[in-house]
């Protein structure tokens, strides 16, 4: 369709719109990840879909994600190019589509810089399904219009059978008129405000309505749907708008949604002024009738209890239930739609807690007993109201997809201020190809199938959806506000892994710096080299890189070497290093080194290796044991009980495996390691585990 757009640059076309604006057109494949990435940075998305082959699953997923997260405006074009058998007709259709794109989308008539108010007027007629398909889209950027103002401007359209306006069968409505639907209705969302666009069959007429006042939403209800079209009559006739209802916006600004559907034209039999109101019949599913019928069918018990009392009962007992647990932020009865194919609504008791979890129970009794519950994690979920876009969405006119395509409700949210009334036996649709006209049998008791507008949805990151419904608009808005606040609070309380790692690295760096600042740690423990960067976990000392290589050659039994800058340092290892240090270690390992020359920075590797081997492996310079009648194992047990670190290190240096693992003569037979664990002394526990202690050795009571 836009072959000359991408002829020069492949899949991308760049066009200058002055010195400060530039339009970039990117052709995207049917890939869900690519479509989402481009939609995040785009202002407008134009979807060209071949309706003859149906929607792909990627299209449905893309529309669902766009509606849940407030992505940009989407203009959908259902193409039927394969249905054209003649090249001349195909070229003509492509030319019309191209013209509409460049004159309506490219020329900035979408309304990106000003508010675009659009209301859906056209619907399907259930009186005669064989009537010609037509579309009526009204855009108003003027003061409230009366029916005389619209009729006097001639919102009518002449068409005849020769132009393909009347289709002889139901199937041909979607096949023979493919060119008209493709070129007209899907692009109607791009028409400039202050225009009235009426399309029937092959022709497209626009009537200007000029004014400078604030925009208002105008809604038209057809009432002359009982007249039939004479398929054999070749004379032209007019489509008249019979009744006009002016609905003012209640919430001021905000973005409204775009809709598209079809309505068959009805020949006008009179040119008199239209009436301003049509009294609803008994079968008209007005909001009042629909709400009362819903309560009487779903919530009225067999004994004739009052539904208002049932609704107030959970609120009266909200403060007296759920003892022993945290008090929820909000709780009450809501309707929940089942996920099964029946799609039935059942009453659930729903609670919202401060931990970011929404829980629903089958009944109030289940909540009191804390059984049969299901939880929804709000930290990975978002909330959505059908027909109402998120507050962060900046779209001026946003599309709505059919409920059959994305599982969302078809009803509009009246909280936005736009109210749409439906005539008897009328159902809205968005795609003439996907939603065929309903049969007369399908319209029986259709008012019972009307969904309420008090519902909201919770969509998780995995795509799972929960549908809830409140009794009133106020209650629904209260739930939505509470859930949104809890989602925000939960996300703000969760620290990212990056920030956690930064905090951990900062605290670890400060702890290692404090270890280097200890007395004696400014020089190597064996050769007095300045600023050592390596450590021995068994000994609790710092050393230079050359001495660390010698320590490694002795194996991990003697010394486990670790770098201060390259390795991770858990809390327990940092405590060992900060508790011992070079000064304390040398007072033990060099306690009897009188007359021996300690290596220096200028000493050779052989001299350093001899000193380290004599000091740690042969223990030639080790301080003597204290004079006592107790065995080494009993002394180690007493030092562990008294938490005497210096004595414990000296005893560990002199002791063997059997002496270190000696148990208490009386009591439960605990070793020194067991006593250190009971005391909670991490330093002694690490030293005993690193030397010759046996952690798996059971106590005398087999614990």
Curated annotation (Swiss-Prot):
UniProt protein name: Arf-GAP with GTPase, ANK repeat and PH domain-containing protein 9
Coiled-coil residue windows: none
Positions of the Arf-GAP domain: 509-629
Single GO MF descriptor: zinc ion binding
Protein function: Putative GTPase-activating protein.
Annotated Polar residues bias: 271-286
ANK-type repeats, residues: 631-700
Compositionally biased spans, kind Basic and acidic residues: 303-318
Stretches for region Disordered: 249-287, 299-323, 427-449
SUPFAM superfamilies linked to this entry: ArfGap/RecO-like zinc finger, P-loop containing nucleoside triphosphate hydrolases, PH domain-like
CDD domains documented for this protein: ArfGap_AGAP2, PH_AGAP
Chain intervals annotated as zinc finger (C4-type): 524-547
Family: Belongs to the centaurin gamma-like family.
Other noteworthy facts: Encoded by one of the numerous copies of centaurin gamma-like genes clustered in the q11 region of chromosome 10.
UniProt keywords, alphabetically: ANK repeat, GTPase activation, Metal-binding, Zinc, Zinc-finger
InterPro entries per the UniProt record, alphabetical: Ankyrin_rpt-contain_sf (IPR036770), Arf-GAP_GTPase_ANK_PH (IPR051282), ARFGAP/RecO (IPR037278), ArfGAP_dom (IPR001164), ArfGAP_dom_sf (IPR038508), P-loop_NTPase (IPR027417), PH-like_dom_sf (IPR011993), PH_domain (IPR001849)
Pfam families, sorted: ArfGap (PF01412)
